[in-house]
């Protein structure tokens, strides 16, 4: 009887530890500039915003200039606007920080599975395993494109007047590219 009770207790402990490790560590941050509440998540050892920034600045827009798209997808920012958009205590991630983020996800899930693991469960048919909740907010170049199909994020790293963007798009890749600084992408802020 004693051993059966110990076995049951040990099973509960193992289950609790497994759940604690598997579930993302989440929180909420309130942006004092406009009162907007953002979900946060710890990935690796870093705290990220778990949704796209929706703070209005010059050189930021809603997809198709529709306010309801800002509410659903966050704002799209030029590179210069993105560099200034994060609240105090947060920053636009550098390429190295995005690379470490990508490596953490791919080392945990594999390159192909990372695509599904990052995508939103309810807005993009993914598993959102890490609570990062990537949504297909599209982008703006000369026109608005990719809504419902792709996600694009700025890094703070620039080169020769252009800047690095990180792109999650079909067929299932999360890749970095150097892009015109006038493009408009989503912003995810990283806690300092």
Predicted regions located by residue number:
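Short, Lys/Arg-enriched N-terminal segments with co-localized hydrophobic residues
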Residues: 1-5
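Conserved positions within compact, well-structured domain cores
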Residues: 23-192
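Sec-dependent N-terminal signal peptides
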Residues: 8-19
